């Protein structure tokens, strides 16, 4: 192993590969980028925001070869001691991160029908990385595994039992790597005892979810069998009455596939506003008095507050509410409006602290005194994946989370 080992973190999406290279000793990011537009003539690779490199018609292995070439140019290839892969769905088979073996790959493939759009892409990334780095230990980190501590009453749907027992239909939850990282950071920031604590983490981005964390374990979460359930999101409807969808199908003649597209791609902030799924665009429109943009934001916030309050019922105590994700970290307006809804929980906002930019990093934004502490903690899923890889790979870990 090189004297200065690094972890390569890979996140293969349906049409892209996001990656980062982190120093094992510090978990500082040394290099990061994205290969996007896989299998199209417009595919490209961008490193550290530099000029894109043409990767026309490249598949996952081609793109990873290009990434490996960029590592070689920076004398980092021999330093790659570990590779961490983000895996979208682990089903009930994976309760924690694991070292990748042939058996693990077979088991990931078994649960992949639960998330076909992402898991098969994840597997393509694993296959390519194992081929390009055959001597490097590789680790799978599952977006669902943090939520495998949910009790049956929290994960079961009120459907006939055979759908659960035969098909695995249940709540799995997502954003687990983010919720796990942020809750761990919260114990330090808020000076809490992990073994006797209650947190609500609100991961708010284009995809959004709430997680109740009791004594260090996820006990409830808003996303379900798929990432569609729960909060209203950028283009996803979130919770919706199935009876309403059945009525729409009857009245319009739309198929199940049509309606899946509607609730996943045409709803949420975009659907209500008719303007954009980008909250930055909607906030500008909010201040300009755009009626439907204001209604979209109000609906988004109402759902956030309702889910935060509801998830508090899964805790034995409520010590803190944490905002994270692109919107949770950066939107002063969304945090302010959400906290105004949550006075019933004893939450009071410090308006000036809430206005601090995300460049300030981890910060408490509740007033003193406030019955419940509210904070903003920037998520770092890449770091959490790297830390899992370091731990499982038996490489000397940083003090943090060691």
Swiss-Prot record:
<dbReference type="GO" id="GO:0005524">
    <property type="term" value="F:ATP binding"/>
</dbReference>
<feature type="binding site">
    <location>
        <position position="11"/>
    </location>
    <ligand>
        <name>Mg(2+)</name>
    </ligand>
</feature>
<keyword id="KW-0067">ATP-binding</keyword>
<feature type="site" description="Transition state stabilizer">
    <location>
        <position position="236"/>
    </location>
</feature>
<dbReference type="InterPro" id="IPR023865">
    <property type="entry name" value="Aliphatic_acid_kinase_CS"/>
</dbReference>
<dbReference type="InterPro" id="IPR000890">
    <property type="entry name" value="Aliphatic_acid_kin_short-chain"/>
</dbReference>
<keyword id="KW-0418">Kinase</keyword>
<feature type="binding site">
    <location>
        <begin position="278"/>
        <end position="280"/>
    </location>
    <ligand>
        <name>ATP</name>
    </ligand>
</feature>
<protein>
    <recommendedName>
        <fullName>Propionate kinase</fullName>
        <ecNumber>2.7.2.15</ecNumber>
    </recommendedName>
</protein>
<dbReference type="GO" id="GO:0008776">
    <property type="term" value="F:acetate kinase activity"/>
</dbReference>
<feature type="binding site">
    <location>
        <position position="175"/>
    </location>
    <ligand>
        <name>ATP</name>
    </ligand>
</feature>
<dbReference type="InterPro" id="IPR043129">
    <property type="entry name" value="ATPase_NBD"/>
</dbReference>
<dbReference type="InterPro" id="IPR024917">
    <property type="entry name" value="Propionate_kinase"/>
</dbReference>
<comment type="similarity">
    <text>Belongs to the acetokinase family. TdcD subfamily.</text>
</comment>
<comment type="subunit">
    <text>Homodimer.</text>
</comment>
<feature type="binding site">
    <location>
        <begin position="203"/>
        <end position="207"/>
    </location>
    <ligand>
        <name>ATP</name>
    </ligand>
</feature>
<keyword id="KW-0460">Magnesium</keyword>
<dbReference type="GO" id="GO:0046872">
    <property type="term" value="F:metal ion binding"/>
</dbReference>
<feature type="binding site">
    <location>
        <position position="86"/>
    </location>
    <ligand>
        <name>substrate</name>
    </ligand>
</feature>
<keyword id="KW-0808">Transferase</keyword>
<feature type="active site" description="Proton donor/acceptor">
    <location>
        <position position="143"/>
    </location>
</feature>
<feature type="binding site">
    <location>
        <position position="11"/>
    </location>
    <ligand>
        <name>ATP</name>
    </ligand>
</feature>
<keyword id="KW-0547">Nucleotide-binding</keyword>
<dbReference type="Pfam" id="PF00871">
    <property type="entry name" value="Acetate_kinase"/>
</dbReference>
<feature type="binding site">
    <location>
        <begin position="326"/>
        <end position="330"/>
    </location>
    <ligand>
        <name>ATP</name>
    </ligand>
</feature>
<dbReference type="GO" id="GO:0070689">
    <property type="term" value="P:L-threonine catabolic process to propionate"/>
</dbReference>
<comment type="function">
    <text>Catalyzes the conversion of propionyl phosphate and ADP to propionate and ATP.</text>
</comment>
<feature type="binding site">
    <location>
        <position position="18"/>
    </location>
    <ligand>
        <name>ATP</name>
    </ligand>
</feature>
<comment type="pathway">
    <text>Amino-acid degradation; L-threonine degradation via propanoate pathway; propanoate from L-threonine: step 4/4.</text>
</comment>
<dbReference type="GO" id="GO:0006083">
    <property type="term" value="P:acetate metabolic process"/>
</dbReference>
<dbReference type="GO" id="GO:0008980">
    <property type="term" value="F:propionate kinase activity"/>
</dbReference>
<keyword id="KW-0479">Metal-binding</keyword>
<dbReference type="GO" id="GO:0005829">
    <property type="term" value="C:cytosol"/>
</dbReference>
<feature type="site" description="Transition state stabilizer">
    <location>
        <position position="175"/>
    </location>
</feature>
<dbReference type="InterPro" id="IPR004372">
    <property type="entry name" value="Ac/propionate_kinase"/>
</dbReference>
């Amino acid at each position: 192993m090189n004297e200065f080992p690094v972890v390569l973190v890979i996140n293969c999406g349906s049409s892209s590969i996001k990656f980062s290279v982190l120093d094992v000793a510090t978990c500082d990011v040394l290099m990061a980028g994205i290969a996007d537009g896989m299998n199209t003539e417009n595919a490209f690779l961008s490193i550290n925001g530099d000029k894109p490199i043409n990767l026309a018609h490249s598949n996952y292995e081609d793109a990873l070869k290009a990434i490996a070439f960029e590592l070689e140019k920076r004398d980092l290839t021999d330093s790659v001691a570990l590779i961490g892969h983000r895996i979208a769905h682990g089903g009930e088979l994976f309760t924690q991160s694991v070292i990748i073996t042939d058996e693990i790959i077979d088991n990931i493939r078994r649960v992949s029908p639960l998330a076909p759009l992402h898991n098969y892409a994840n597997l393509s990334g694993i296959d390519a990385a194992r081929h390009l780095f055959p001597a490097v230990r590789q680790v799978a980190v599952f977006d669902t595994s943090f939520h495998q501590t949910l009790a049956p009453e929290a994960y079961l749907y009120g459907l006939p039992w055979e759908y659960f027992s035969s098909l695995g239909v249940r709540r799995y939850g997502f954003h687990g790597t983010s919720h796990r990282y942020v809750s761990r950071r919260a114990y330090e920031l808020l000076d809490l005892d992990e073994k006797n604590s209650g947190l609500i983490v609100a991961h708010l981005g284009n995809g959004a979810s709430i997680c109740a964390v009791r004594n260090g374990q996820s006990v409830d979460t808003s996303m379900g069998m798929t990432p569609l359930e729960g909060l209203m999101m950028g283009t996803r409807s979130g919770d919706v009455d199935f009876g309403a969808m059945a009525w729409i199908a009857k009245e319009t003649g739309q198929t199940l596939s049509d309606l899946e597209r509607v609730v996943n791609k045409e709803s949420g902030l975009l659907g209500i506003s008719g303007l954009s799924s980008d909250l930055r665009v909607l906030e500008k429109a909010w201040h300009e008095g755009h009626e439907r943009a204001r209604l979209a934001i109000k609906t988004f916030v109402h759902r956030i507050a309702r889910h935060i309050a509801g998830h508090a019922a899964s805790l034995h105590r409520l010590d803190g509410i944490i905002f994270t994700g692109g919107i949770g970290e950066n939107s002063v307006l969304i945090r302010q409006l959400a906290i105004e809804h949550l006075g019933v929980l004893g939450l009071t906002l410090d308006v000036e602290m809430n206005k601090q930019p995300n460049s300030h990093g981890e910060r408490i934004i509740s007033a003193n005194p406030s019955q419940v502490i509210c904070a903003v903690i920037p998520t770092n899923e890449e770091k959490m994946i790297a830390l899992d890889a370091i731990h499982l790979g038996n490489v000397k870990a940083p003090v943090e989370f060691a």
